[in-house]
């Protein structure tokens, strides 16, 4: 007897009340997309949990993929048997025997959801625990801190046995909170912001500002590689690559050096907001962390934000750099982010940027420029590619067929 299914627990989704089924269906669809390489599996779901029937598929690679699906609190390999005491005993014993149990401790934790079952939970604990002890060697009982917790759940459709919980990615299923545009540079912070945004259920489309010849094709490829890492958590992601050279040069030539960074960020936000409207997004996500650099002081963010009424979400706002780096390493974006290819945010960085810019002065400087046609041109010439975890990338036209 082998594990024949994986039991999935929802966690935060259980608080969603009448809307829970919307979240559960989205999670099922996200899991099905993630596991499409395993055609024999079958996914069954109910209000409080989900089951993946393996039907002969190997569980190890499936477990690895489930760890990156948002909306899963935890999951366990499981066996199912009839609501019969003898069958439950043998199933629990088989589950323990598939583990390296010798020299370990265990306990049995039974839960009788089906109140028609003739044995109480404590009686099941005793009966099954005694059977396991009789049929194994070098395994002892520890009810307080066991190495192995044999969980038995008697439900109306059958009894489920698990022995080991694996923590999932948590959060909410991607797509349940709407769509947002992620302003993605080649640095450490913005990919982490994208990851955390998806963890809260957002579908993201990435926007990258590309300034050739000052930034190279290698810098562009670096961003594509970062997006591909994020697809492990969110599925296919659109990447919008904005030609930004003319806008950036106009600002650099027409705005005093200490204010150029603020005006550049304002232009980026205007373009991103226009792309958001075109793509029917509801918010913009950035990798800003309060006080980390000159453009991320509260005064700077206030002046930059003035160009839009769209919600600007900043998942990293209270994190320090070391916390951000730790997450970047966990999601495998760190080593790509530190590759030495400059992005548009670094090539025209002023020596002494204003950390407390005045909105009136920014507006005065920008009034001397005719940026609107350049912004419109950048929006119209934006290149869109679709990046997938498995398939790599395709341009938007190809991706439609």
Curated annotation (Swiss-Prot):
Keywords: ATP-binding, Cytoplasm, Nucleotide-binding, RNA-binding, Thiamine biosynthesis, Transferase, tRNA-binding. Residues 60-165 form the THUMP domain. Pfam families: ThiI, ThiI_fer, THUMP. Pathway: Cofactor biosynthesis; thiamine diphosphate biosynthesis. It is found in: Cytoplasm. One of its GO terms (cellular component) is cytosol. One of its GO terms (biological process) is tRNA 4-thiouridine biosynthesis. Its EC number is 2.8.1.4. It is an enzyme of class 2 (transferase). It comes from the Bacteria. Its main location: cytoplasm. GO terms for molecular function: ATP binding; CCA tRNA nucleotidyltransferase activity; tRNA binding; tRNA-uracil-4 sulfurtransferase activity. ATP binds at residues 183-184, 208-209, 265, 287, 296. It catalyses: [ThiI sulfur-carrier protein]-S-sulfanyl-L-cysteine + a uridine in tRNA + 2 reduced [2Fe-2S]-[ferredoxin] + ATP + H(+) = [ThiI sulfur-carrier protein]-L-cysteine + a 4-thiouridine in tRNA + 2 oxidized [2Fe-2S]-[ferredoxin] + AMP + diphosphate; [ThiS sulfur-carrier protein]-C-terminal Gly-Gly-AMP + S-sulfanyl-L-cysteinyl-[cysteine desulfurase] + AH2 = [ThiS sulfur-carrier protein]-C-terminal-Gly-aminoethanethioate + L-cysteinyl-[cysteine desulfurase] + A + AMP + 2 H(+). The keyword tRNA-binding applies. Gene3D superfamilies: 3.30.2130.30, HUPs. Catalyzes the ATP-dependent transfer of a sulfur to tRNA to produce 4-thiouridine in position 8 of tRNAs, which functions as a near-UV photosensor. Also catalyzes the transfer of sulfur to the sulfur carrier protein ThiS, forming ThiS-thiocarboxylate. This is a step in the synthesis of thiazole, in the thiamine biosynthesis pathway. The sulfur is donated as persulfide by IscS. PANTHER family: TRNA SULFURTRANSFERASE. Belongs to the ThiI family. This is Probable tRNA sulfurtransferase.
């Amino acid at each position: 007897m082998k594990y024949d299914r994986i039991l999935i627990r929802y966690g935060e989704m259980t608080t969603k009340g009448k809307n829970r089924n919307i979240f559960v269906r989205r999670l099922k669809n996200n899991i099905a997309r993630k596991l499409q390489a395993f055609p024999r599996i079958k996914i069954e779901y109910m209000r409080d949990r989900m089951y993946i029937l393996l039907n002969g598929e190997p569980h190890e690679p499936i477990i690895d993929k489930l760890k990156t699906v948002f909306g899963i609190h935890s999951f366990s390999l499981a066996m199912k048997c009839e609501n019969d005491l003898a069958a439950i005993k043998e199933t629990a014993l088989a589950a323990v025997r598939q583990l390296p149990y010798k020299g370990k401790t265990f306990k049995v934790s039974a839960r009788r959801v089906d109140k028609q079952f003739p044995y109480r939970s404590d009686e099941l604990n005793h009966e099954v625990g005694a059977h396991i002890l009789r049929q194994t060697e070098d395994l002892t009982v520890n009810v307080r801190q066991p190495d192995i917790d044999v969980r038995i759940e008697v439900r109306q459709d059958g009894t489920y046995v698990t022995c080991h919980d694996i923590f999932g990615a948590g959060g909410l299923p991607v797509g349940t909170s709407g769509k947002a545009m992620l302003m993605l540079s080649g640095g450490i912070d913005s990919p982490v912001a994208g990851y955390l945004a998806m963890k809260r259920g957002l579908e993201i489309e990435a926007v990258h500002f590309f300034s050739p010849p000052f930034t190279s094709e290698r810098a562009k490829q670096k961003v594509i590689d970062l997006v591909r890492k994020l697809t492990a958590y969110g599925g296919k992601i659109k990447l919008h690559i904005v030609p930004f050279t003319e806008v950036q040069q106009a600002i650099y030539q027409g705005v005093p050096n200490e204010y150029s960074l603020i005006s550049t960020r304002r232009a980026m936000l205007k373009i991103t907001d226009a792309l958001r409207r075109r793509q029917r997004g509801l918010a913009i996500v950035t990798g800003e962390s309060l006080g980390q650099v000159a453009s991320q002081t509260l005064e700077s963010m206030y002046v930059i934000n003035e160009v839009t009424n769209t919600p600007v979400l900043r998942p990293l706002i209270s994190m320090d750099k070391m916390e951000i780096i730790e997450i970047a390493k966990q999601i495998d974006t760190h080593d790509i982010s530190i590759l030495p290819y400059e992005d548009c945010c670094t090539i025209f960085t002023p020596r002494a940027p204003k950390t407390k810019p005045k909105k009136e002065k920014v507006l005065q400087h920008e009034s001397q420029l005719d940026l609107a046609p350049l912004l419109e041109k950048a929006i119209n010439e934006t290149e869109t590619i679709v990046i997938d975890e498995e398939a790599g990338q395709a341009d938007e036209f190809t991706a439609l067929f």
